[in-house]
Amino acid sequence: MRIDSDLLDFAIENKLDYTIFRLYAWKPACVSLGRNQKDDFLDRSFLKENNIDVVRRLTGGRALLHADEITYSFICPTLYLKNGEHVVSSYKEISRILIGKFKTIGIDLDFGSNKPIKTGFDYCMLISTGADLCYHGKKLIGSAQCRKQGYILQHGSILYDYDKALLEKIFKEPVSTDEITSIKEINPKLTKEKIIDILSV
């Protein structure tokens, strides 16, 4: 994610008028914390024993486990988007690009609920907002933004698969399969490489 920060600064310094889209995975696995999120819920000893790093994102939101997933970052000038000045509208405008990509492989995504957020959860994927992407009501992609000097950085995590027991150990809260889903659950035949190919076009 340091690269994303550097790319954001590069865009600002060079006054880029186009987008930067990046896909990546993590090795070793890593917990990323939202920009202003407290970290007192983390068991650092457990994470160290299991070779799981911890970083803090530039973007907001809540914590994610980057393990069996694909992370994306999208950088653009605020004025590049039709409604770039409006936070929720800009989330949706960027996310509609992902909706279109996933539709080509038979995965129809929609935006999450606009219900009040349950603020007790530390794990991002357990909270579905109107800017998140869901499959049949279950969250598949969680995203977060930051803004700096007229530019937007949006991060997102696309769940390929997940370890329910590990998530519950890290975040100390029940992970309901009624709340989240994964690419592997939707279509086990889809590989990470296929997803990356589709998103890269």
Language model: regions and residue ranges:
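Non-catalytic, conserved peripheral segments adjacent to functional cores
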Residues: G142-C146
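Long, positively charged amphipathic alpha-helical accessory segments at protein N-termini or as interdomain linkers
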Residues: I94-I117, Q149-V201
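Residues forming anionic-ligand binding surfaces in small-molecule and nucleic-acid pockets
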Residues: R62-L81, F171-I183
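Short, conserved charged micro-motifs
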Residues: F41-L42, L81-V87, L166-E168, L190-K194
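Short, solvent-exposed loop/turn segments at the edges of secondary structure
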Residues: A67-E69, S128, L153
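Helix-start/capping segments and mature chain N-termini
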Residues: A67, T78-L81, V87-I97, L166
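Active-site loop/lid in soluble adenylation, ligation, and acyl-transfer enzymes
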Residues: M1-S45, E49, D53-R57, C124, ...
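Beta-rich nucleic-acid/ligand-interaction surfaces
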Residues: F111-Y135, K139
